[in-house]
């Protein structure tokens, strides 16, 4: 069984993916993490990703699909797709890639959050460069200021989490990703979660309830 988490940057997809991995043994497919890995290794694909990310723009479909395809060769079941696909072209490409392994997207969860809440969340976000855990100065403060709860690594702010770049990302999301909602409503089991006033745990319980596991 494979599932997808849809929603704007900052809606909590990463937090839900973390819960699903830790509590239900799913495997997270975070294209952000996959791209950052390519960047850290200074691969050709990574250098191309870096150029677009530094400008606050989405990486083109062709590059992202290549990175995902590399991953699917070794992992193609009990996956969580977090932040990918972002466009109809990516969605159709993903379905074709999964079909090679007789797999599909079984559930799509759309986490809907107000834009002003999203901006506040993202600009207050800190991440651990070692284990990739995410914290927030407003909603999920680390136990010790500036340090990761899990490995004591100094937390950092992602370069694409500045206010200007966040606004660009949200606008691009509206233009490119919102059409996916209609597409997946007819191609998978689609569940919308209104999360403005829900805690991360409440969102997780809704997801778990739908999965019936």
Swiss-Prot record:
* Annotated metabolic or biological route of this protein: Purine metabolism; AMP biosynthesis via salvage pathway; AMP from ADP: step 1/1
Q: Which gene encodes it?
A: adk
Q: Which reaction does it catalyse?
A: AMP + ATP = 2 ADP
Which parts of this chain are annotated as the region NMP?
30-59
Subcellular location(s) of the protein = Cytoplasm
Record InterPro entries: Adenyl_kin_sub, Adenylat/UMP-CMP_kin, Adenylat_kinase_CS, Adenylate_kinase_lid-dom, P-loop_NTPase
Q: Is DNA repair tagged as a keyword? A: no
Q: Which PROSITE patterns match?
A: ADENYLATE_KINASE
Q: What is the recorded name of this protein?
A: Adenylate kinase
Keywords, ordered alphabetically: ATP-binding, Cytoplasm, Kinase, Metal-binding, Nucleotide biosynthesis, Nucleotide-binding, Transferase, Zinc
